[in-house]
Amino acid sequence: MSAVTNTLVHDLFRAIDSREFERLREICHPDVTYERPGYEAFSGIDRLLKFYREERVIASGDHLLTAALVDGAFGACWGRFVGKHRDGSDLDVEFADTYEIEDGRIRKRKSFFYRPAV
């Protein structure tokens, strides 16, 4: 297990939860791909940033990680997201992510939720 890449997963959620989306340029590979239920895959860092800034249905909240495991170029994490939808409703959702890591950055992320299209 690599402490550097484990930190990368935690850094990803800190940047997202604090809405410091520009930090994702340091954390994610320029050619990042992100797959999540309810959306077409996001390809490239600029497309990912557009999603977080303009399209995401989540207004605010925190990812509470139960665990993050990384082995070489692959990783996974799971936990719970607690926050607010843009419509004002409360969110409390279990999730799991898988990662592919290239050149010290997240190259591919795939999210799984225990409810439809969060």
Predicted segments, located by residue:
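A beta-strand edge to alpha-helix "cap/lid" segment located at domain peripheries
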Residues: A3-V4, D11, A15, E35, ...
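Short, low-complexity N-terminal intrinsically disordered segments enriched in polar/charged residues
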Residues: M1-E26, P30
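Short beta-edge strand/loop motif at the mouth of beta-sheet-based domains
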Residues: A41-K50
